[in-house]
Every structure is written in structure tokens, then in C-alpha cells.
Amino acid sequence: MAAAAPGNGRASAPRLLLLFLVPLLWAPAAVRAGPDEDLSHRNKEPPAPAQQLQPQPVAVQGPEPARVEKIFTPAAPVHTNKEDPATQTNLGFIHAFVAAISVIIVSELGDKTFFIAAIMAMRYNRLTVLAGAMLALGLMTCLSVLFGYATTVIPRVYTYYVSTVLFAIFGIRMLREGLKMSPDEGQEELEEVQAELKKKDEEFQRTKLLNGPGDVETGTSITVPQKKWLHFISPIFVQALTLTFLAEWGDRSQLTTIVLAAREDPYGVAVGGTVGHCLCTGLAVIGGRMIAQKISVRTVTIIGGIVFLAFAFSALFISPDSGF
């Protein structure tokens, strides 16, 4: 028993060593595994913010150009800016046309040129009288528009307000004249024009007698085309042209056309003025005496003064740079 005890003690010693060594060997492995797992976990956590931060610059840089495009694309209304001048031009033309035609109508109805065309149309060929009067009025309108357009070298602000003052002066004068007129003012104007035309006819007949006999007595022959040409360029045509041009020169309608061309679209003023003269002269040629008896020159003059004052008053609400 005593001999076997040492053998058993020797045999149990290695077992005890193994029992002690295995935990010792396992402990470092566990210790190594634990920190490695913790470190791996810790290493995995920090990259997560890094991975989240790395795409952020890309995400920020990516949407920024899109945002810039969204901001700048609607802020460049190229088409609207191109269309605005054309729209303003059309409105300016219409405004000038309406202003010119309305002012010419209220200025020319019952005027001296109106009665000249009316009386000559009752005595001579209407088409010849209308052609001569319209040529004179067309030339006068074009000259007046050129005079008014020449003032555009002056800044528009000055011409705009000067023309406004002139409109107010014309309106006040027309109102005063209309209120002071007698109801028979149109008949007096008509008789005055008749006397003037009678005087012109007497001078024409006297000149014709002084020039000698006609073509038949001299033996000269005139072909048919020459007769047509002489019929168109007849003394009546020349008389209507000269009388209308001289009566219109310095008249209120000429001054009004100059003032309108200085502040409005010149093309609109030219077209509107020509159409207004054509309407008034056409009425005078077709039924001038009847119209002169039906309408009152006093009423037309008062209405004209109101129209002029309305244009002057509108300047208080329209900017000079608006194009109207």
C-alpha cells in the first residue's frame, strides 16, 4: 500500500498539471478572443459614422447642382422679355391710331377744309374734288408726322409733358370757342367758304379768257389718252389741292398731328390721321351740305375740347416711358 502510493502520486501529478494548464491556456485565448471581439466591434462602430460621413459630401455635392439648376432655370424668362417689346409696340400703335383718328375727326368736322370739300363737291366732279383734297391732307399729315418725329431727339420726358400742356391748351381754347359760338356758326363758315370759292372761280374764268381761244380754234388735235390725263389733272383737282393744303397749314389739326407724333408711335399717328381725314372728307364730298345742316359746329367744337382735355388728363396716369 505504501509502495503503490508513490506511483499513484506520480501518475496524478501530470493530471493535476493538465487541469491547471488547460485553464491557463484557455484563459489567454479567451482574453485574446474577448478583446479581439470587442475591438472588432469597436472597429466596426467607428467606421459606421465614417461610412455615413463619406457619402454625405457626395450626397451634398450631388443635389447641389440640381438645386442650382432649379433655382436658375425659372429665373431666366427669356421668352417673356422678347415678347414684351413687340406687345408694347402693338399697343403703342393702337393707342396712337385711336388718338389720331379721334382728334382729327373732332377737329375737322365743320372746319374750313370740310366746307371747301363739301361746296366744291356740289359744284364739280366729286371724285376729282376728293382726290385733290385727300392728296393735300395726306401730304400735310406726312409732313406733320415728320415734324413731330424730328423732336424725338429731345428726351421723351420733356416732349411728353410739353405735348400734354399743349393738349390742355387746345382743349381749353376749343371749349371757350365752342361756348362763345352762336348756333349758326356753321352757316357763317359755309357762306364764307362759298364766297371764297366764288372769287376763285371768277379769277379762273378771267385767266381762261386772257389765255386765248381753245384747242378747237387753234386747230390742235388732242388724243383720247391725253384727254383722260388732262381730265384727272384738271384745274378743279389743282384748286381742291391748293385750297385744302393752304387751309390746313397752321390749322389746329396740323398742330395736333405734330404734337401726337412727338409723343406717340409715328406710324400709328400717320395711319390714324390719314384715315380720319379720309372719313371727314368723304362725308363732306358725299353730303356736306346736309351734314352741315344736321350737325352743330358748336357741339362738335365742345366735344373736341373735351377730347383734348381727356388726352391731357390721361398723362397724369401714364408714365412717359410706358410707350403709350
UniProtKB/Swiss-Prot annotation:
Effect of E108G: In CDG2K; does not affect the affinity for Ca(2+) and Mn(2+) ions
Predominant location category: Golgi
Domain of life: Eukaryota
Tissue: Ubiquitously expressed.
Coiled coil region boundaries: 184-211
Cellular component GO terms held in the UniProt record: cis-Golgi network membrane; endosome membrane; Golgi apparatus; Golgi membrane; intracellular membrane-bounded organelle; lysosomal membrane; trans-Golgi network membrane
Phenotype for R126H: In CDG2K; alters subcellular location; does not affect the affinity for Ca(2+) and Mn(2+) ions
Biased composition (Basic and acidic residues): 35-45
Annotated stretches, region: Disordered: 35-59
Membrane topology listed for this record: Multi-pass membrane protein
TM region(s), chain numbering: 90-110, 127-147, 152-172, 229-249, 268-288, 300-320
Keyword set includes Transcription regulation: no
Key words of the record: Antiport, Coiled coil, Congenital disorder of glycosylation, Disease variant, Golgi apparatus, Membrane, Signal, Transmembrane, Transmembrane helix, Transport
Composition bias type Low complexity, residue spans: 50-59
InterPro entries xrefs: GDT1-like, GDT1-like_CS
Disorder noted: Congenital disorder of glycosylation 2K: An autosomal recessive disorder with a variable phenotype. Affected individuals show psychomotor retardation and growth retardation, and most have short stature. Other features include dysmorphism, hypotonia, eye abnormalities, acquired microcephaly, hepatomegaly, and skeletal dysplasia. Congenital disorders of glycosylation are caused by a defect in glycoprotein biosynthesis and characterized by under-glycosylated serum glycoproteins and a wide variety of clinical features.
Function noted in UniProt: Putative divalent cation:proton antiporter that exchanges calcium or manganese ions for protons across the Golgi membrane. Mediates the reversible transport of calcium or manganese to the Golgi lumen driven by the proton gradient and possibly the membrane potential generated by V-ATPase. Provides calcium or manganese cofactors to resident Golgi enzymes and contributes to the maintenance of an acidic luminal Golgi pH required for proper functioning of the secretory pathway. Promotes Ca(2+) storage within the Golgi lumen of the mammary epithelial cells to be then secreted into milk.
Sequence similarity: Belongs to the GDT1 family.
Full protein name: Putative divalent cation/proton antiporter TMEM165
